Amino acid sequence: MTVVHIGYKYGQNNTGGAAIAATRLHKTLLARGIESHYVCVWQCEDGKNVHVLPRIGSVARQLYFFATRGLRGFWKFTRWRKSIPLNIIPMFGLEKLLNKIRPDVVHVHWINADVIGFNQLANIKCKVVVNLHDLFMINIIEPYPGIDQRYIHGVTSENSSFLERWLFKRKLRLVHKLNPVFIGPSKWVCDCARKSIIGNSCRAYAIPNIIDCAFRYKPEMRLQHDKFIILFGAYAGRRNPSKGFVDLEKALSMLPEKIKDKSELWIFGEEANDCRTRGVKTKFLGNVSSPSNLATLYNQADVFAFPSVQETQGMTKIEAMLCGLPVIAFDRTACAEGIENGVTGWVVNAGDVKAFAVGLIKQYDEVFSSCPSDEMRWKIAKRAKTMFGEYEILNRILEVYRA
């Protein structure tokens, strides 16, 4: 079997969740002895069978960026005030490469930044799998619809602009012609696909993203400390609005002063000077590129704060649990999937920051109880390994490829 992945970036260092997940899948397939190729616009680390298109240094690459960035950026100067991908421009050189590789499956990952033209994608002759890292393929413009239900009920001249109707119809034609299989990393995102007008005729399988085997619980990595370590991390850290740091701030403000004094907030994914957040000492760890270094942080922390507003899975949540770290999350989109409330962490109602603070207090009490135990952390790690083990997930993906 030969598989070709298509995505915007390749690599695991500060590239975003979709690129990290796709890179790990590519590497895992290669390790299993399956011929896997990765086609991307930007290669951010060395890798086997990675193809950068349009070719670096070529005139075609310059034209590609001029056209895609120009078309996407034009909308910033209109009433939309933001970039809007149109996916009109083809990825130069893709047809020639696919004819040479002759894949059995093309696995489409994150193409939101005009990576590939929809017409070009529709003409791929082999089986196509689309990974729902977000809802870009089945929504109108935004990667997450929020409260907008038009992706379920449809667009009309009364509820949508010409641009929205045009984009929606292009995606509808693409999916109907391509008839892809959807893989979503959570039940929530697959349910969204099944309910959507664009994706309701396609099969959708809920299969988690593959997580690096470096993430596992190691008691010897636990540091002896007299602080309560709250870990938070995301691409761009606090500045990423979808990760919900504002809600975490509110929850921290509700902690008793005694707990604030004995707590530290560690933030990875952002470079900044150390400070205090609502009375809690805050330490910035920058971009953590190595999975083993990130696993060390998970093992050293006492709780992982996961206040995300919208997620199709939330890889940091799973990485934390594989390292035996309890997670506190809001029950919104797929943020809480995989957490067993009161056993492997705490799930609180969407936006209930007071309950989020209570979860932090409960874990604080557990850590500083008279007889703290590793039993909970072992239980979390074991359960996460059962749910998110690399071998089991890869086998499920291969079943989809072969079906």
Q: What residues fall within each predicted segment?
A:
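Membrane-proximal helix-turn-helix segments that form the acceptor-binding/catalytic region
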Residues: 96, 136, 148-182, 195-200
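Conserved donor-binding/catalytic core segment of Leloir-type glycosyltransferases
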Residues: 222-243, 249-252
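Nucleotide-activated donor-binding/catalytic signature segment of Leloir-type glycosyltransferases, i.e.
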Residues: 269-292
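Short alpha-helical donor nucleotide-sugar binding micro-motif in glycosyltransferases
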Residues: 296-301
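Aromatic "clamp/platform" in nucleotide-sugar-dependent glycosyltransferases that forms part
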Residues: 309
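Short hydrophobic beta-strand element within catalytic cores of glycosyltransferases
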Residues: 326-329, 339
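Conserved acidic donor-binding segment of nucleotide-sugar-dependent glycosyltransferases
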Residues: 341-342, 346-353, 362-368
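A charged, aromatic-enriched C-terminal amphipathic alpha-helix characteristic of glycosyltransferases
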Residues: 371-401
